[in-house]
Amino acid sequence: MAKSKKSEKTTEKVLMSVVDVEQKYVYDPAEDVYGGGDGVVSWGADNSLPKLLINCAEKSATLKACIDQSINYAMGDGIIVNEEAASWAEKVNRRGLSMKDLINRILADFFTTGNFAIQVIFNKLGQPVELFPLDVAKCRLNKDRDKVIYNKRGFSRWGTAGERYDRWGYADFDPERPTMIYFYNGDGVRKVYNTAPWAAALDDVLTEIEGSRYSLNSVANGFSARYIIEIPDTANLTDEQKDVVVEGIKDHFTGTDANNFMVYWGNDEGKSLEVRKIEADETPERFQAVRQAAKENIFTAMRMSPLLVGTAVANTGFSTDEYMSAYKLYNRTIALGYQDMIKSVIDDITGVENAIEIVPFSISFD
């Protein structure tokens, strides 16, 4: 039996809809873009992805709480530099930065962008003697990933200019160039730059940020109007007189209704003043549901329970027993992995096995 033209059009429309959805996921604004020759690989489609990630981390309350607590849990109750690496115990550079400070800085970059960078300075014997955490947003890799390009002012959109340094692990020590940069980018297999731990919830982070802006605008502008005040026979009123009338209405309205009205200036003679209430819609409820869903997705992407950042769970509140259970699971499956990553990096740079220990995080509600 032949399909009708209407059926064919419906099928075609559905297929096109599916294709449109698929196309949204073919193009990735976070995708690396390779330059010509041995040029800089753009971090994101326009080389400005780090700025977006940093802005999100600073403006999303939920994401910031997750990042801050992730750093705390990964840092444990402190850093111990073992005897074999005693030269790093007091400080790691001439500025007096401690090993704890260094690790805190690179973890902040890691949880924000998924990457971090450390400048390593050598003595004439090729031994590392100073470590400086770099702002990873100001670093880029070349196509072969063996050079780190650093721009102390940061990269502009499509910008590629910067100082080139040998990347740690990709070049032998050169006495003429006593500086290398250790650039961590995960396994670096699928993409040049690692993905932020929360990247799967990027849309949700932006939703929360825009939701906060919407709330601010609503408060600043008195929320939506709840009443229409129709004033008849106003054809001869001047704008100044209308302003006086509006101010008079505000003076007589009180509480939350003081600014929640619209005035309709009618021309009908003999008609009495009329006040009508605008029927409320479900926008606030839907808005709240969207914000709550966004928060939940951010926690999911960070693989954290809201309890771990001190947020009460809906319908259950805050329970110390549930918190301890959530922490034990998070520590065993997530935090220890981050700690192993950090210890491996420090071992690699210092050339000392088990150079540091991270004191287990202790929790007491006494």
Which sequence ranges carry the predicted segments?
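Structured, contiguous alpha/beta core segments that scaffold functional sites
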Residues: M1-G266
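Short acidic DE-rich linear segments
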Residues: A2-K3, S364-D366
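A contiguous, surface-oriented mixed alpha/beta subdomain in the mid-to-C-terminal portion of proteins
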Residues: V189-V345, I356-P360, D366
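His/Asp/Glu-rich mid-to-C-terminal helical/loop segments that flank catalytic regions of hydrolases
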Residues: I349-T350
